[in-house]
């Protein structure tokens, strides 16, 4: 019951409600996991990041709204769930709802031909986030996966924003002059 807020005999609410979606429960669990982690003596609560692939990419976006998250990297998800049939679902659990609240540094991993986190939705997602510290990696012909050559960007992103042991190169300036 992930892409639905409809009621069923086993859902929390007997009317259409975001709480009936598996996304609500997963996001709640992720927020509780953050609370658990920040209470552990071996964890620095000021250096928490979140990464997820596919459905985990959507969950990464839903979790990155939490101010305790200092860096995020959604892979193949979290940008395209905005066309659900339910107006209530779109207004509460659509990717744009979470993206508009993200202020932490975020690295989008988006293969060029992914069927789940569609690259055509990436410019809209980037424009929706509040963070000005963002990057995108796009791998050609990798469908719904990220391979080590592209995944390394995630590790470096977290090294920069959580460990302060790396600095990503600046985005080069580009221009186009038509004569």
Locations of regions flagged by a protein language model:
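Primarily recognizes the serine-hydrolase "nucleophile elbow" in alpha/beta-hydrolase
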Residues: 32-90
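Alpha-helical scaffolding within the catalytic cores
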Residues: 58, 86-97, 120-124
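Short beta-strand/loop motif that positions the catalytic acidic residue
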Residues: 102, 108-110
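Short alpha-helix in the alpha/beta-hydrolase fold that links the catalytic acid
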Residues: 104, 118-127
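Acidic catalytic loop of the alpha/beta-hydrolase fold
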Residues: 112-117, 144-145
């Amino acid at each position: 019951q992930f892409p639905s807020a409809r009621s069923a005999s086993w859902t929390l609410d007997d009317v259409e409600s975001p709480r009936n979606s598996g996304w609500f429960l997963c996001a709640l669990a992720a927020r509780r996991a953050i609370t658990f982690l920040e209470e552990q003596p071996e964890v620095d609560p000021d250096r928490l990041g979140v990464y997820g692939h596919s459905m985990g990419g959507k969950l990464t976006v839903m979790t990155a709204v939490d101010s305790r998250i200092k860096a995020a990297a959604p892979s193949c998800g979290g940008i395209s769930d905005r066309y659900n049939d339910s107006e209530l679902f779109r207004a509460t659990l659509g990717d744009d709802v979470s993206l508009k609240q993200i202020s932490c540094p975020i690295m989008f991993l988006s293969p060029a031909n992914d069927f789940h986190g569609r690259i055509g939705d990436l410019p809209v997602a980037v424009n929706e986030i509040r963070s000005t510290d963002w990057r995108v990696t796009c791998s050609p012909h990798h469908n719904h996966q990220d391979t080590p050559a592209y995944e390394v960007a995630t590790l470096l992103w977290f090294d920069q924003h959580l460990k302060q042991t790396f600095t990503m190169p600046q985005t080069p300036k580009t221009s186009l002059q038509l004569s």
